[in-house]
Curated annotation (Swiss-Prot):
UniProt KW Transmembrane keyword: yes
Family statement drawn from the similarity comment of this UniProt entry: Belongs to the herpesviridae US22 family.
Native organism: Human herpesvirus 6B (strain Z29)
Stated name of the protein: Protein U7
Gene Ontology cellular-component terms listed: host cell membrane; membrane
Membrane protein topology class: Single-pass membrane protein
Subcellular location: Host membrane
Amino acid sequence: MSNFRLILETEGGKRVLCESIVLHFAFMFQTEIVPVCNDEFTLSSCVPTLDFDVDVLSAAYGDGLEISSPGLRCCIAWPPMYALTLGEFYHFHTHRWVSAYDWSSLLDTDEFLSAIGYAHPIYRDPNPDYDPYVMHSSTGKTIAVDTVTEKVYIIAESLVQFFNIGLRQFPPFAEAELDPEQEKMWFGETKCGREEFILLQRNLPAMKDYVAKHCGKRIRVDAFQDFDFSFCSLSDIYYLTGPGILEKITEKDYAIIGTCARSQAEPNCRAAIVMGSNCHIYIYVENRISKVSKSLRTFIRRGFDELLYKEKYSLDWNDDTLFYISDTETENLNRMLNGELPVLRSKPRHMCVRKDRLVKDRSKILFAVRLDEEDSLTVKFITKFLTPVFVGRLPATSRFVVPVSCARLTNGLQGTAAARFGIKGLHPSSDCVVWNRLIDYEYETYKYPSTYVRADQIADMVKNLKFMDNFDEKWQCITKLAFIGLYAGASLFNFASKPTLGYWCRYLCEYASMLLFQFESKLKELTKESTRQLGGYNLCHWGQELKDCLENKSDVFFRYDFFERIESCLIEHFMLLCGCVECRRMFIMYNKRGRKCDFGHCVRIQCFPMIGSIRLPAFLHLGEPYSVSLSSLIAKDLGLSMIEGQIEHSRLPISLQISVTPDKKALLTFLTNIVFIVFVVNTLYRVINAELDIYYDLFTEEVGKLCVTMEEEMKLGRNGCLGDLCYFSSMKQMKEIVRCPGEKSQFILKCWEALRIGFSVPAYKDYDETRFMEMFFLHHLHIKRFHEHNDRDLVSSDNLIPGFFIVNTHEENFLQRLQRVVLPVAEDYLTNTRCINGTMAFFFSGLKYFGSGNHRGVQISPEKDVRAIGYKLGSLDVLRDDYKYYEYAPDCAGELNGHDGDE
């Protein structure tokens, strides 16, 4: 086995091929140099039964890192029905050398390549001039050569990664023309065949026109991750994070073609996707435009993979407008697409009243309907309130136009609590409030419970709900019960969701357990002198108490007597290990008056007013500024943002300012933090129980009303109830719920059972929502407003709902999602000892600290605000012949009469 090579030894000892010398000799002697292969092997036509892995490759190599067992065929992870046939280039009788690619700019100067083989469909032999050839470098990277264009790509960072992903990172496959069956096999349900937008992907003006006509159309993006892409244009967007961004995008000849995010993302939390004049695809994030794909088809098939994997490795990735991103920026992009990257603002944009032309001058708005949708019942539902106008009689200047289409109107219903959550009968102003509160929990818009409306405010909202005048008052209890059941389930019983109290209770219980274990190790690390000062009895007693506490973790952190015990232990340890004037005074005060002594400041937690004023623990050696800062953070959100911020930076939440030996300081710091975390857990538990009482009282009150109403309907025989066996059975179930509402810790299950019965009541199920929908559409399309901005929920919903018109957000029912994840509000669940969150437990088991005791600054993890896009439903536009235009006329036949609006 040999082939013609000319090798020189470089100073670094690397063996390289001098291609220029080889070509010179070939020219001199006019001799064709061809590879010579003395090894004959027969390619197998059968389907390979062996999967490619590192061991298979190692066994195929002989001396000198050359394939000594050519012809072995293995399956690879992707594409489907592809195999890898091992062998050197010369085994396949091709005029190439592996060493010729050592000069690639993808490799460092001291890297060299070794052969692996050709990747090809399993039903045929490799085609040396068509199929990609795979190699690996001396540093572990896996390289693929496109034998058609001779371009080289890095497709994996290691052989193990190549084993797991196959040729997913091979760019030519993302642009391949595939038949529908093969397209589905390779890339799932993405639409990249002969669809119109794929045919227009190299025609920017035509693409703009397509996007304008198909605004809101949603397609799946990326066969390997859960993304979706929704078409929308620049005229559909009100703002992108910072001011002036939209103008800069248009000045640079970029066009917004849509938004993208992982599924289950709110429309306003999506990333803007931009097409450049070169028809490449870019993403706008963090005030920068970065290229993610060379075509729309590649983007839909591979999503953001090229950007995240750093396509700069590719030799043909040349573009002056490309911004390479760092590892940190890549991580930020991942976090943004997952809805985790906070956008820091003094006030969220969706809470600000818009200065929009739609609001300023509604009398000059035109409503545009495509001619092919003019006869649609959905469109007629709105145009009956409008008067058609003739385009020829209008001035030639641009007018402010609001598109009206079936897709928009259908999507827009998801901006109501009636359509999205099944909560019927509310007046649109109250519907907006309920929808706004529930949508925050459905999309987990924020991460701290303190940001959400708590139970006492929900109780006030329930009492003040406004209903439509044609909705029977006696069935209002079903609507209220639905709101209570959904909000209580999302805020109290869903421990898997970060915004809930139960999640943070679990999180801090795991943290406290870890700190107790660490404290036990700190006791063992004390010097003999420190141990003598502490006293053997105290040390042994606390060690045994530690074991008892950890064995009974299911309730110990919630007991106030346990908190007082460790607080007194903290004071004793400071007295024994420090003994300064401050420590002695605190020790004497505690021994004289015990728990009656006011050791710390009292604060009222702003977000949890129902528990009243609480006493802070007796912390020592914090320093006045640090102590004041800590008190303000506790008053703001119970210190949750500070705790998470410190943990993210591998620091303990509290650090001490004390002059003692390092072993003593470490012990006292850990004990101080244990006291603080147990205090927070104890307070959270009080809040949970207080909210549980509020929701339980609301539930029993409304379910009692529902039972009485159903019984009255049965006696009076209304709506066919008298002879309806299903209704009679439902009424019996409702009576049983009233008689036995169940334990308070899991009343939500009974609440949802009552809700199921309530939703099936004929009078509620068949309620005519026509008037409600009319008011909703007329308001948000700016035809006839039923309220102006006067409440934070109304402002927020007015700003958020346009995104639901434009982006199709038909998702799984929120109640069904909650039913799969709720847990009882019981101590063993709250401490993560039952139905364990393994990820959380694993995180704290490996948590390390680095110099946490020396950091006096406090790191705050900011509240999440990822609503980066604001949408609008109209813009300045030139009038077109393929649209029919309408305007609002107060005296038109379809004018609303008698609606209980407050315009």
